Amino acid sequence: MNRREFSKNVLMLGIGAQAGFGQGNPAGTRNQPTNYYEEPAKKLPVRKFDVVVAGGGTAGVVAATAAARQGAKTALIEVKGYPGGTVTEGGTALHSFYNLWKAFPGVKKRQVVRGIPQEIIDRLMKVGGTSGHAEMSKGYDFDSVCTAIDTEIYKLVTFEMLVEAGVFVCVNTLLAGAIMDGSRIKGVIAESRSGREAFYAKCFVDCTAYGDLSAYAGADYTEPNDYPVVNSIGVANVSIDKYYKFLKSHDAIYQQAEGWRSGKDGQIVRIQGRTVKLPAGFREEAAKIGMSTVTTTVHDNYFMFIKLNLNMPVSPTNRDEVAKAELELRKRQAKAIELFREYVPGCEKAFIARTNPKICIRRGRLITCDYDISHEDVIEGRHFDDDVLTYGFHDSAPSYQIKDGGTYGIPYRALRVAGVQNLLAAGMLITSDHRAHMSTRNTVSCMGQGQATGTAAALCAATNCGTRELRYRDLRKALVNGGVYFES
């Protein structure tokens, strides 16, 4: 879809259904409604910045912090009331700060993602908000390290870091459009209960997960719709040690990691069972609701994540499809609690203590960038002459692993949105190959992409250049000064 088609669609407001799930399609899809209301023009107050980051999730938090620390006057626009995104809503742990060394005897252990992402972990450690980098004692052919977090503490710590860096943090604020000057973004439109405003800037970063800013700016994109819908719940009044014994009694343990939990080291912080070995009643009902047995925690009596998958065709840009998925997943959450109460010792009085504000779809719009990372780039461990991030995890392991427990590089050009002079992208909105995306979309990769794009945006703003005119040596120097690790 091109800019003209998208812009035409988003300016048309259809009359929705009066009750139940709507049958109409949202902006950017076929079968548009035939009745419209034309909004009158009005003057908007303007705020001016060097850098605007759209989306305060996994990548956006780091991007905005990096830009501000680089000296840029930075604004962050986030639709929810807190930062964090998928880290606090859909993930089971942060994957992964390290290479997959444990699966390859003789390979050196090395932390390959550092900088601001590691600083977040350091601050979480001080307040009991993470397991630390807990080594996997079982299942290390999937990941060598599990970094579990407390979702609520993560929100607080990252919010504080943004404010300390001097970021103008706009939570509860909706990105509503882009103001274009040819192929350059002049500003964005944001709406909140304080009103509708224009945010002008020299450079922009799209960290919206579903590519909202890129679409508003007219960038090319597709919608692969190639992942299940996911939601997770936090479950309280449970015992992870008894859950471990339950899985062990059925010889079902597949993954296990020990780290900091409730102030003590060496405790189980991640565990996953092989569902096929569990009692038939549990196994069959878990399959029906798409429930995984994996959980992580940093507390004795709390499962931070119980994940549920829903295999139904849902586009995150289609409001009505999403509504149906939201309802179905809520029903599945209730069933998941019933299963734990019935089958798992120590969970007889379990209850849901946290739900996500919305479903998570691992990919929405796929934004076209100047370079598209291939699966061969990932598994062959390729590095580039414009690397901005070193990464070593693949979510399809052990089926797919990076060669010899090594790493690959994400090049700067893979984060430049094609056709737009001053827009960068970070997060799960890049990488077309599904297998490659199973690596690049993971949380720690997104965090590293955030530091790269935020730093680059600040440098572009400081030198009044477009994203393609930025000298790589200047970007690399700034990233190294920010603690980023390079293998090439």
Model-based region annotation:
Residues 46-57:
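Beta1/beta-strand and adjacent pyrophosphate-binding region of the FAD-binding site
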